[in-house]
A protein has these predicted regions:
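Basic, helix-initiating cap at the start of DNA-binding domains
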Residues: 1-41, 58-61
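Short linear capping/connector segments at secondary-structure termini
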Residues: 106-115, 196-197
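Amphipathic alpha-helical packing segments from all-alpha helical-bundle domains
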Residues: 89, 112-163
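Short hydrophobic/aromatic patch on the recognition helix
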Residues: 43-53
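Hydrophobic alpha-helical connector segments
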Residues: 62, 73-101, 113-115
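Alpha-helical DNA-contacting segments of helix-turn-helix folds
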Residues: 53, 57-67
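C-terminal peripheral helix-coil segments that are non-catalytic and often amphipathic
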Residues: 2-3, 130-138, 163, 167-205
Length: 205
């Protein structure tokens, strides 16, 4: 029979999770935030931070890894019969992880972490490329450009939109979905029809 984790171990795990959440939130708005700022946001001491992370770069790599794990899981588990619905649903679910998206994107602006970010997000990028190819081949997505280029435009547009701090209204997820659908060739009327016919696009997980 496995013994339960002792209180100190549980506290250490809770502190680590608190630090990662705080780092994600702080770095989403301030990519140059210090360890002191992150520790303060987590309600912990600087010493507690160093007890889990050797330095600021180590913590930033952990933030990238934690975010990528969620993003890649979303990519792998979002699969509808209509590629337009799949893309819209994926955009909705990623928007709900906007803080993690912004933190990872901000960290990636630092060349020292660009390679880490690219590698961590490779599964998500591959999923978008495969989905785009399916959408183009089926006629669901625009066919006036190579699928590889369209996938790149989807990725870059989604990243820019998800990082937009001014999207704070209750229907911000709808805005994100409409922006992405417009990139793949849907008119605003077609977007409205698709959203109306597929309420699952905005369903909670």
């Amino acid at each position: 029979m496995t013994a339960p984790n002792p209180p100190r171990r549980r506290d250490a795990l809770a502190n680590r999770e608190a630090m990662l959440r705080a780092a994600q939130s702080v770095l989403a708005s301030n990519p140059t935030a210090s360890l002191d700022a992150i520790a303060q946001a987590a309600g912990l001491t600087r010493r507690a931070v160093y007890g889990h992370f050797a330095d600021r770069d180590t913590l930033r790599r952990e933030v990238i890894a934690a975010g990528a794990q969620r993003f890649n899981a979303i990519a792998e588990t979002t699969d509808e019969s209509d590629p337009r619905v799949t893309l819209a649903r994926m955009a909705t679910r990623l928007w709900r992880e906007a803080s993690a998206v912004r933190a990872s994107a901000n960290i990636a602006l630092d060349d020292a972490h660009l390679t880490d970010t690219v590698l961590a997000l490779a599964p998500l990028r591959h999923r978008i490329r495969d989905l785009t190819r399916t959408g183009v081949d089926s006629g669901a997505f625009r066919g006036d450009m190579p699928a590889e280029l369209l996938a790149f435009l989807i990725e870059e547009t989604a990243r820019a939109t998800l990082r937009e701090l001014r999207l704070t209204t209750a229907d911000a997820d709808s805005t994100v979905v409409r922006v992405v659908l417009s990139i793949v060739g849907l008119s605003w009327r077609e977007q409205a029809e698709l959203i109306s016919a597929h309420p699952e696009i905005f369903a909670q997980d």
